[in-house]
Every structure is written in structure tokens, then in C-alpha cells.
């Protein structure tokens, strides 16, 4: 992003700049629909919105989705349709399920795969606002964990009262089982870094 500036907004992260010739606001505020909805509300109060892109990680619910693959939603289940950006890079499409909890295990993912192709935690709140405001909506995600992969811990237990992930809780859990937990967390960190790079490359190449 060119000419990035940091606005004084009450969010975890916010930058204003230009991407592919368009003015953009990049914001992040933590996991879940409440925090994501608050982020979009703050943006709307401060700038004019021409389109909204919900982006980040997702969990695959079908074997056809591999780690670091780009997933573009055609629909957020229960919250309406989503548009598809133009990109020269490969991506897969399908239905996106948005729920307010981390789907931690492959066992939990299996039944969800009957109604959607991927799962995440924020898109529903963003989609509902976009449709209410008649603003074009996109949901672009990158797969951080396949349908047959489980996380090394239940990250739902690692959230603070406001819904954000607590680094202190994660570190405490890792210290209780260092021999098994730490190597798995390092693998997860490596996997998510690779996925984040793939997502960034795709977004930089896309037209919304």
C-alpha cells in the first residue's frame, strides 16, 4: 500500500493509503462478529465507503481446499451473497460459514462441511452491514488449516472477555505442555505466515 497513514481510530489496527490506484482503509479489530462489526462502523463514520472486503484466514471444510489456497466466497451463509474480484492469480470459490468461535478440530469441521466450503469468524457481521448500506461486498480468505487438520489447543479458551485472543493465556497453556504444545504452535505459526503472504499477494493483484 502506498502512502500509508495511521488515523486516530479506536481500533487494533488502521491504515489509510492507496492500493492499485484506489484509496483504501485497512482495519483489524480482533476475532468475531462483534469486533469486526465495530471496525466497519468506525470506518463508515470517518470515510466514504465504495466497497467492503472482509479478509483474513479461514478453515477449510472440504478436502479440495489446501493450506495457503485463496478462497473467495460467493455467499456468506445466512448473510447474503458476495462478489468475486478480478485477479490473474488462482483461487477457489464457494460458500463461507461465519460463526463466533474457533473450529478447533477436524471432528468439529466435518458436519459444517455439509453446508459450507470454509469457515471463519467475521464475515457475517461485515456482509450484513454492506448489504444494509447497499455497498458492494467481497469476502476473500486464505486457508490456514485444512478440513483434516486440528489446532494444538482450543483457542476459544484463549480469548479475553472482550473476545480478543490473549497472548498470556496461550503462553500459559504452552508452558503446561511444552514438549507437545510448543512444536505444534511453531508449525502453526509457520503455516499462517505462509498463508498470510499468499493472501497479501492475491489482494495486491486483485481489482474490487
Ranges and model annotations:
Residues 1-5, 70:
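Short, conserved "active-site rim" segments that organize catalytic pockets and cofactor/ligand binding
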Residues 9-208:
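Glycine-rich phosphate- or other oxyanion-binding loops that anchor nucleotides, phosphorylated ligands
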